[in-house]
Structure formats: structure tokens, C-alpha cells
């Protein structure tokens, strides 16, 4: 369990760095959307961000911030697998884990996702951006981090036997 907590802390630190550069991230997505002639559709999946990065990203600053987003998503995905291996779960932890796995899936539609208070990532966007283009993609990481913290909190309340059973 300590290893999982440490992994989550590490991801949170990377996210804090990423969050400080949200305007750079939005600008990078905007540049890629322009290059792709795709200004109408919202950013709706991790897969779409990856495609933009691979095919429509023209400068190192944009590539770096998009890669940072992709790396955090990849680490969240790996942590989901680590959670799964830790114990067989309860209905509550299994539900939280399924939500996490769905959210970090490459093709999951993020367009309607919106982080709520205390997260202010959506508030930093203009109304048009928040409503139409980037609200989902900037909400993904804080929502998944919250679900993972909740999973850990519920898992720590389980009897030791349940936790040990999952590792044998």
C-alpha cells in the first residue's frame, strides 16, 4: 500500500507542475487544432491529444507539454493496474477502480467531463473554451487523482487479510 501511495504522490507532484502550465497546454492544443484544421470538435479523448502531438505538433514547447499530459495519463493507467493487483476489492473500491480505468482509457469520451470544486482548472478557461473545447481534457487528471485517493482511503479501512489475499 505504501508503494501505491508513493506512486500517487509522485503523479500528484508531476500534475502540480503540469497545472502551473495549463495555459501552455491549452495553447499547444489550440496550435495543433489549427494545424489539423479541426477547430470545431472539442478535445474528446487522450487518443486525440496523442494524435495531435504525433501529427500536428510543430514546436518543442507544445510537444513537451503534450508529452507531459500523456505521461501523467500513462502513469495513472499503470497505477490503476497496480491497484487491481493489490487486492480483490470490495464493491466500493471496484467501482472507484472501474471509473478510473474508464477515464484513463485512450478512447474514452472526455468532452462532457468537468472537474468541480475544489478544483479550479475549468475556471481558468474562458467560457467558450470551458464549455466547448477543453473543459473535459483539463478535468481528467484531477478527477482521476480524487478517485484514486478515495480508493486508497477505502482500501486502508479493509482488514489486513483482504489486502494480503490480493497479493498472494
Curated annotation (Swiss-Prot):
Subcellular location: Cytoplasm; Cytoplasmic vesicle, Secretory vesicle, Acrosome; Cytoplasm, Cytoskeleton, Cilium basal body; Cytoplasm, Cytoskeleton, Flagellum axoneme
UniProt site (Essential for interaction with INCA1): 117, 119
Protein name listed in UniProt: Sperm acrosome-associated protein 9
Assembly and interaction partners: Microtubule inner protein component of sperm flagellar doublet microtubules. Interacts with CABP1 and CALR. Interacts with INCA1. Interacts with microtubules.
This protein's UniProt keywords: Cell projection, Cilium, Cytoplasm, Cytoplasmic vesicle, Cytoskeleton, Flagellum, Nucleus
A GO molecular function held by the record: microtubule binding
A Pfam family annotated for this UniProt entry: SPACA9
Main localization category: cytoplasm
Organism: Rattus norvegicus (Rat)
GO biological process annotation, one example: axoneme assembly
Function according to Swiss-Prot or TrEMBL: Microtubule inner protein (MIP) part of the dynein-decorated doublet microtubules (DMTs) of multiciliated respiratory cells and the distal singlet microtubules of monoflagellated spermatozoa. Forms an extensive interaction network cross-linking the lumen of axonemal doublet microtubules.
GO CC annotation: acrosomal vesicle; axonemal microtubule; axonemal microtubule doublet inner sheath; ciliary basal body; ciliary base; cytoplasm; cytoplasmic microtubule; nucleus
Expressed in which tissues: Testis-specific. Expressed in round spermatids.
Amino acid at each position: 500500500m505504501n508503494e501505491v501511495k508513493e506512486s500517487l504522490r509522485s503523479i500528484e507532484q508531476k500534475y502540480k507542475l503540469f497545472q502551473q502550465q495549463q495555459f501552455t497546454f491549452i495553447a499547444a492544443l489550440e496550435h495543433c487544432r489549427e494545424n489539423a484544421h479541426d477547430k470545431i470538435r472539442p478535445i474528446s479523448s487522450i487518443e486525440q491529444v496523442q494524435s495531435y502531438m504525433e501529427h500536428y505538433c510543430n514546436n518543442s514547447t507544445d510537444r513537451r507539454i503534450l508529452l507531459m499530459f500523456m505521461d501523467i495519463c500513462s502513469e495513472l493507467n499503470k497505477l490503476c493496474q497496480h491497484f487491481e493487483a493489490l487486492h480483490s476489492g470490495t464493491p466500493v473500491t471496484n467501482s472507484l477502480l472501474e471509473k478510473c480505468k474508464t477515464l484513463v482509457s485512450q478512447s474514452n469520451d472526455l468532452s462532457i467531463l468537468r472537474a468541480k470544486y475544489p478544483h479550479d482548472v475549468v475556471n481558468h478557461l474562458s467560457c467558450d473554451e470551458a464549455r466547448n473545447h477543453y473543459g473535459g481534457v483539463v478535468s481528467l487528471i484531477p478527477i482521476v487523482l480524487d478517485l484514486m485517493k478515495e480508493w486508497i482511503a477505502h482500501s486502508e479501512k479493509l482488514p489486513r487479510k483482504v489486502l494480503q489475499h490480493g497479493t498472494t
